[in-house]
């Protein structure tokens, strides 16, 4: 086998590995009314709902309640919240401990919450609080609250 053939095969192999790893992705175009951050699109609701209805609305729009993976993303979301419609209690996020108390999971993929930004003393499960939200009273740090709290904003 000639050097040119070996180089060609190696080039194709490397291209395949890079493509398979997902590092070569097309640019993300978000629907009208959605905001782009890195490779994701986010929707900040102008209306309020309880957690279950908010989750259904996100699914209807082709998404899910927001999953926060790191402090940088959290900071960006909080910045966007401060520029959005204000809701009395804050905004729903896509985590809950509905199945096992204290076992906070992201509802889109059931993964455990690893990064968090809980307000001091939270989550405390007062009154059976099983759903997570960005709490407006404490600069949008995280809090657990009763899932049927109405008029909470939501982020998909």
Swiss-Prot record:
Keywords linked to the UniProt accession: Disulfide bond, Lectin, Secreted, Signal
InterPro entries listed in its UniProt record: C-type_lectin-like, C-type_lectin-like/link_sf, C-type_lectin/snaclec_domain, C-type_lectin_CS, CD209-like_CTLD, CTDL_fold
One Gene Ontology CC term in the entry: extracellular region
Keyword Secreted applies: yes
Entry GO MF terms: carbohydrate binding
Pfam families, alphabetized: Lectin_C
Matches recorded under PROSITE patterns: C_TYPE_LECTIN_1 (PS00615), C_TYPE_LECTIN_2 (PS50041)
Chain ranges of the C-type lectin domain: 37-156
Tissue expression summary: Component of the organic matrix of calcified shell layers like nacre and prisms.
Signal peptide: 1-22
Main location, first listed in the record: secreted
Disulfide bonds: 30-41, 58-156, 131-147
Name of the protein described by the UniProt record: Perlucin-like protein
Phylogenetic lineage: Eukaryota, Metazoa, Spiralia, Lophotrochozoa, Mollusca
């Amino acid at each position: 086998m000639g050097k040119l053939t070996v180089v060609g095969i190696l080039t194709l192999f490397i291209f395949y590995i890079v493509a398979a790893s997902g590092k070569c992705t097309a640019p993300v175009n978000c629907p009208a009314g959605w905001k782009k951050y890195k490779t994701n699109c986010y929707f900040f609701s102008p209306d309020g709902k309880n957690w279950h209805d908010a989750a259904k609305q996100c699914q209807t729009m082709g998404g899910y309640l927001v999953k926060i993976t790191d402090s940088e993303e959290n900071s960006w979301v909080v910045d966007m919240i401060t520029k959005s419609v204000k809701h009395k209690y804050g905004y729903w996020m896509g985590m809950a401990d509905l199945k096992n108390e204290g076992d906070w999971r992201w509802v889109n993929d059931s993964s455990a919450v690893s990064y968090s930004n809980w307000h001091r003393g939270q989550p405390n499960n007062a009154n059976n609080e099983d759903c997570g939200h960005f709490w407006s009273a404490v600069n949008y740090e995280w809090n657990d609250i009763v899932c049927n709290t109405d008029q909470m904003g939501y982020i998909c």
